[in-house]
């Protein structure tokens, strides 16, 4: 028996079947950074049209988590796809470096500023800590395969950023948006000063818990708001009840709050023969009645909280009325569902009060004693006044219940004494005094929001948001570099010049320069006596929110407004909002053209990842086990606009999808063995018909994939890529061409036509994959034949995919033939199970069908057998089902399968009547003889 193996074109490639990504990727990364790949990309795209995706800064604290990975991978996919579209698309990564979390971490190590270390030393420790965190996160981001200017990131603690943030503040002042107001802060009456969050400790404290009745002014109006069960309005005064553990704040009460969507009940109560009506959260009626000791009561009707808005109630012991307002912080967790609101003594009360322009009453002095003009309680310390207030409530018939509770309460870390919330002067960006609210709403309309619901979400927030308090009493932050009049609080008339001078100092030496500054240096001796240096710092949301000015507008390689902001959906209230506010305030336009949001990662039960639940999957573990490309493929294969479910099983499924794509790519490469694109290409119109079809399909697919990338639909990209690899390409085309690839003459038209198709597909597919599976795409790129740039990332989408113009068969024709093939395969498999045949090549398939389908099948001639992977196919035109045939899913198609009587060719394994006809080759068929010793077979169709 002769060995014909050496006459076959067996597939061969150095591209391995196994990715071994966890081991291979770090080596590739090392080479990329040694080669300055990012710099090469920038050079290759210099002068091209720009696409700027501005990176929202993650907080420089702790390891990156899966949410960080999702965010950075999505950005990287978009930037790489834009680069392949021949845009110059730099990505400048950023970090948010100021604020409380870093201060808390540093405090654990060195203590609180002003105690064991000076404020200056504390800031240096914060800077060093943030720098270390940035470096740690940077390593992980790079490991993800994210391309960015990692050597020159923007940090909000960089001196130039801090200086530019101060300059933006100056421009906001210049445009008339800044004003000074009051806001409640933690206040220690023993220190006589405000406390930062970090200076607050929580300890158990016993407090009086009281239920207080407020009587409605317009009794008929409030009752008419209710949907009364039987039309009965009830009798007695109508009031509502609040529950509080801080009676001392009642002198500052300026409203009672309900929740717009909660249901409230109008309850008829009889107490010792007296009738009254009370409005309470319907879920809390039973608990409240038990607490009040009322046994006889019934509900008259119900209403949503929104219907009570703006009704007036009488203050329980002062001679004025306060409104009913709606507020988001109202719950039915405890109390009555109605909340006492004192804007001068609570953060949530303050925010709610801004919307209704409530007075921020603060009758309490710095020492915790009521001011002299405080009616009834002047001169009393607030905590000692609780008992007095309870007595006054009793006298006015307003006290419904009184008992003591022990609860967690904020205390001063120095004095270990209870603290209060007290309104103090703060700096605000006004939403209305210079039309910022309306201008922002107009710009929201001019921005494309993806998904579309983002527009209404942020618009509703802007419509309802209060003025933005931008001042913080922190140590580690950008200073509000202003000089304020010691008597009036007004800022210096030369503020614009002074801000620039302060910015220059900070640009040279960092924020410590402001704290070290002697005011007389900039103001002169006389003004320094009248004006004091503001010690407040800027809200960290201001820091990140001005990155459009400090980074996009400031760096030479970037231009604003940015084309895209991409962050989690929580950033409508956060970075998207602060960026919009500051940009509109100083520039009159939005800082972005498009805003895209992604959802959060949850486990298979829909729960957020948390250490306490033990359901955290770290990106580092996924990369170390499976590789970054698996993580990247998972991100791209998920509907990222909603919650993204993760589990080990889901990542393993992602690995399975990856293997299918890798194996398909390997098959393409292996069958390009010996192919030189310069000399061996066949023009598309000269190709075998099946090759024309697959190239045309790939060309159409590329159009669809590029459109999906342009609309940020990565899930659609991966679906189309997977469907191609498992369907038309993998299950059909690559299956059919094996015979031609392996057995045809190596340099024959039949084989070169096929190799040309494979080459075009491999060139295109590698680029389709590159934004998502970057490591694998580069690995394929290096294994492709022909001359090319060193990196797929410096190239553009493949332009060699040209649809043929002279195809004998349309795409619909081939899809119909493919459907017939599926039916043939189904019956071949049944014949194998019944042992009618062994391999499918042992079968003769007889097809009986109508005229139209028969004509298409017969047009393929003898090559139809290659499509069905059988040794013989007979097509007969019929009008009805012949005997001994089986019906199919295709109307009018009938099939029978029989074993062939022909002999098996030892080279191609087909069964043929002409095996052994050539004496020199007694074991092979005539086709193989031609391919071994002759001119080689001709293929026209398959």
UniProtKB/Swiss-Prot annotation:
Catalyzed reactions: tRNA(Ile) + L-isoleucine + ATP = L-isoleucyl-tRNA(Ile) + AMP + diphosphate
Biological processes annotated in GO: isoleucyl-tRNA aminoacylation
Cofactor needs: Zn(2+)
Residue numbers binding L-isoleucyl-5'-AMP: 567
Localization, UniProt: Cytoplasm
Enzyme Commission number, as recorded: 6.1.1.5
Keywords from the named record: Aminoacyl-tRNA synthetase, ATP-binding, Cytoplasm, Ligase, Metal-binding, Nucleotide-binding, Protein biosynthesis, Zinc
Motif ('HIGH' region): 58-68
Coiled coil: none
MF-aspect GO terms: aminoacyl-tRNA deacylase activity; ATP binding; isoleucine-tRNA ligase activity; tRNA binding; zinc ion binding
InterPro entries cross-referenced by the UniProt entry: aa-tRNA-synth_I_CS, aa-tRNA-synth_Ia, Anticodon_Ile_BEm, Ile-tRNA-ligase, Ile-tRNA-ligase_type1, Ile-tRNA_ligase, M/V/L/I-tRNA-synth_anticd-bd, Rossmann-like_a/b/a_fold
Domain of life: Bacteria
Binding-site residues, Zn(2+): 905, 908, 925, 928
Similarity field: Belongs to the class-I aminoacyl-tRNA synthetase family. IleS type 1 subfamily.
Record remark on domains: IleRS has two distinct active sites: one for aminoacylation and one for editing. The misactivated valine is translocated from the active site to the editing site, which sterically excludes the correctly activated isoleucine. The single editing site contains two valyl binding pockets, one specific for each substrate (Val-AMP or Val-tRNA(Ile)).
Function (record text): Catalyzes the attachment of isoleucine to tRNA(Ile). As IleRS can inadvertently accommodate and process structurally similar amino acids such as valine, to avoid such errors it has two additional distinct tRNA(Ile)-dependent editing activities. One activity is designated as 'pretransfer' editing and involves the hydrolysis of activated Val-AMP. The other activity is designated 'posttransfer' editing and involves deacylation of mischarged Val-tRNA(Ile).
PANTHER family the UniProt entry points to: ISOLEUCINE--TRNA LIGASE, MITOCHONDRIAL (PTHR42765:SF1), SOLEUCYL-TRNA SYNTHETASE (PTHR42765)
Oligomer status and interactors: Monomer.
Protein name: Isoleucine--tRNA ligase
């Amino acid at each position: 028996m002769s060995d014909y193996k050496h006459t076959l074109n067996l597939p061969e490639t150095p591209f391995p079947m196994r990715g071994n990504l966890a081991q291979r990727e770090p080596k590739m990364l090392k080479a990329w950074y040694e080669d300055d790949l990012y710099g090469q990309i920038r050079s290759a795209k210099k002068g091209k049209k720009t696409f700027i995706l501005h990176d929202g800064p993650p907080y420089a604290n702790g390891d990156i988590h899966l949410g960080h990975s999702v965010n950075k991978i999505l950005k990287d996919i978009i930037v790489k796809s834009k680069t392949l579209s021949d845009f110059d698309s730099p990505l400048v990564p950023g970090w948010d470096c100021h604020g409380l979390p870093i201060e808390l971490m540093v405090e654990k190590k060195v203590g609180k500023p002003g105690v064991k270390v000076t404020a200056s030393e504390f800031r240096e420790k914060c800077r060093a800590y943030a720098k270390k965190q940035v470096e740690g996160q940077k390593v992980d981001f790079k490991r993800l395969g994210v391309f960015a200017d990692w050597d020159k990131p923007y940090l909000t603690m960089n001196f130039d950023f801090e200086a530019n943030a101060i300059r933006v503040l100056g421009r906001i002042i210049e445009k008339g948006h800044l004003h000074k107001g009051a806001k409640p802060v933690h206040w220690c009456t023993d220190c006589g000063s405000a406390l930062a969050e970090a200076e607050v400790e929580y300890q158990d404290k016993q407090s009086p818990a009281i239920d207080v009745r407020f009587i409605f002014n317009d009794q008929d109006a409030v009752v008419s708001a209710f949907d009364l069960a039987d039309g009965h309005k009830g009798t007695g005064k109508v009031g509502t009840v609040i529950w509080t553990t801080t009676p001392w704040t009642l002198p500052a009460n300026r409203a009672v709050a309900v929740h717009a969507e909660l249901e409230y009940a109008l309850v008829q109560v009889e107490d010792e023969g007296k009738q009254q009506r009370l409005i309470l959260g319907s879920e809390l009626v039973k608990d409240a009645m038990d607490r009040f000791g009322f046994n006889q009561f019934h509900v008259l009707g119900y209403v949503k909280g929104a219907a009570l808005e703006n009704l007036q109630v009488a203050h329980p012991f002062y001679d004025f009325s306060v409104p009913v307002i709606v507020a988001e912080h109202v719950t039915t967790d405890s109390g009555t569902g109605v909340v006492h609101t004192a804007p001068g003594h609570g953060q949530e009360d303050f925010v709610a009060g801004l919307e209704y322009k409530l007075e921020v009453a603060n009758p309490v002095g710095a020492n915790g004693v009521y001011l002299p003009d405080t009616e009834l309680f002047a001169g009393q310390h607030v905590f000692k006044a609780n008992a007095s207030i309870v007595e006054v409530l009793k006298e006015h018939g307003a006290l419904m219940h009184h008992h003591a509770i022990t609860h967690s309460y904020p205390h001063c870390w120095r004095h270990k004494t209870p603290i209060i919330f007290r309104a103090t002067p703060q700096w605000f960006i006004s939403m209305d005094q210079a039309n910022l609210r309306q201008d922002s709403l107009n710009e929201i309309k001019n921005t494309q929001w993806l998904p579309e619901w983002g527009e209404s979400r942020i618009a509703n927030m802007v419509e309802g948001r209060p003025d933005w308090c931008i001042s913080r009493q922190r140590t580690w932050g950008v200073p509000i570099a202003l000089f304020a009049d010691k008597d009036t609080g007004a800022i210096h008339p030369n503020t614009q010049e002074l801000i620039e001078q302060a910015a220059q100092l900070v640009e040279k030496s960092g924020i410590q320069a402001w704290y070290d500054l002697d005011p007389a240096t900039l103001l002169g001796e006389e003004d320094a006596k009248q004006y004091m240096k503001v010690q407040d710092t800027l809200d960290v949301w201001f820091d990140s929110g001005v990155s459009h000015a400090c980074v996009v507008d400031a760096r030479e390689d970037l231009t604003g407004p940015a084309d895209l902001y991409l962050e989690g959906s929580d950033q409508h209230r956060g970075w998207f909002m602060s960026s919009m506010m500051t940009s509109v305030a100083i520039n009159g336009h939005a800082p972005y053209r498009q805003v895209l949001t992604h959802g959060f990662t949850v486990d298979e039960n829909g729960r957020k990842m948390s250490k306490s639940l033990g359901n955290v999957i770290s990106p580092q573990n996924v990369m170390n086990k499976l590789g970054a490309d698996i993580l990247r493929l998972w991100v791209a294969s998920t509907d990222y606009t909603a919650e993204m479910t993760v589990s080990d099983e889901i990542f393993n499924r992602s690995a399975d999808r990856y293997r299918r794509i890798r194996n398909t790519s390997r098959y393409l490469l292996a069958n390009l063995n010996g192919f030189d694109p310069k000399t061996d290409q066949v023009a598309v119109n000269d190709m075998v018909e099946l090759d024309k079809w697959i190239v045309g399909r790939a060309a159409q697919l590329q159009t669809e994939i590029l459109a999906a990338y342009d609309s940020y639909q990565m899930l659609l990209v991966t679906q189309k890529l997977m469907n191609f690899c498992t369907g038309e390409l993998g299950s059909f085309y690559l299956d059919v061409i094996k015979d031609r690839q392996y057995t045809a003459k190596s340099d024959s038209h039949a084989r070169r036509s096929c190799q040309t198709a494979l080459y075009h597909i491999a060139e295109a597919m590698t680029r389709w994959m590159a934004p998502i599976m970057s490591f694998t795409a580069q690995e394929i790129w290096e294994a492709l034949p022909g001359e090319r740039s060193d990196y797929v990332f410096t190239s553009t989408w493949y332009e060699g995919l040209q649809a043929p113009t002279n195809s004998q068969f349309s795409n619909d024709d081939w899809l119909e033939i493919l459907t017939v093939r599926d039916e043939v395969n189904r019956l071949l498999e049944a014949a194998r199970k019944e042992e009618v045949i062994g391999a499918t090549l042992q079968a003769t398939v007889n097809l009986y069908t109508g005229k139209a389908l028969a004509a298409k099948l017969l047009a393929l001639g003898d090559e139809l057998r290659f499509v069905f992977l059988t040794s013989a196919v007979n097509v007969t035109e019929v009008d009805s089902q012949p005997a001994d045939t089986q019906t199919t899913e295709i109307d009018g198609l009938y099939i029978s399968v029989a074993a062939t009587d022909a002999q098996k060719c030892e080279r191609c394994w087909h069964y043929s009547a002409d095996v052994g006809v050539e004496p020199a080759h007694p074991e092979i068929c005539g086709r193989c003889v031609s391919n071994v010793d002759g001119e080689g077979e001709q293929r026209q169709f398959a």
